[in-house]
Regions:
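Polar/charged, compositionally biased leader and regulatory segments
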Residues: 1-72
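Short, flexible loop/turn elements at secondary-structure junctions
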Residues: 25, 35-43, 69-71, 79, ...
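Short, solvent-exposed loop/turn segments at the edges of secondary structure
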Residues: 62, 94-96, 158
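Conserved beta-strand positions that form and line the central face of beta-propeller blades
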Residues: 66, 125, 151
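Generic structural motif
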Residues: 67, 73-83, 143-146
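Zn2+-dependent peptidoglycan hydrolase active-site motif and core
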Residues: 77-136
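Conserved, short, structured surface segments that act as functional micro-motifs
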Residues: 99-103, 139-158
Length: 158
């Protein structure tokens, strides 16, 4: 996760040790992760993982960054922004309770570059949250970098 050295706040405060999943070989239902905190990689080919009706077996590319953590772990705004939307996505395989934040940022043109791109809008989807998280913010609310905006939900909520 992006840390304070970049000017961003971590979305979840990770311990020193956590697991980074490799789902490129498909799911293994017999294996259990030995760590309480885990990362699921962005832009990863994941064969056989999206089997619910929501995806109709047609998806195999993961387009987000997953952070696994114990239930009720705090979730923070990574940058200043606004709550764009919130709600519950109840379909099997979907996000469950979800908050989307909108941010306007100037990011470097490349890694290690001091030259910045123009201001661009970004939307961050915070999914698999606790249902109570939907009462912690309101659509249109301003959020500040590092502000508590949600907590991780349990499996029955997601």
């Amino acid at each position: 996760m992006v840390g304070s050295e970049s000017g961003f706040h971590p979305g979840v405060l990770l311990p020193d040790e956590y697991w980074v999943f490799d789902f490129t070989k498909g799911p293994n239902s017999n294996w259990r992760c030995p760590f309480d905190y885990q990362i699921g990689r962005y832009d990863e080919y994941r064969p056989g993982m999206y089997t619910t009706d929501l995806f109709s077996g047609e998806r195999d590319l993961h387009v987000g960054l997953d952070i696994g953590a114990p239930v009720h772990t705090n979730v923070y705004a990574f940058a200043d922004g606004v709550v764009y939307s919130l709600g519950i996505n109840p379909e099997a395989g979907s996000y469950g309770p979800t908050i989307i934040t909108q941010h306007e940022l100037r990011l470097p043109r490349s890694v290690d570059s001091m030259e910045l791109n123009p201001v661009r809008k970004f939307w961050v989807l915070h999914g698999h949250l606790s249902t109570e998280s939907l009462t912690m913010v309101k659509v249109g609310s301003v959020v500040k970098k590092g502000e508590l905006i949600a907590t991780i939900g349990d499996e029955k909520e997601n």
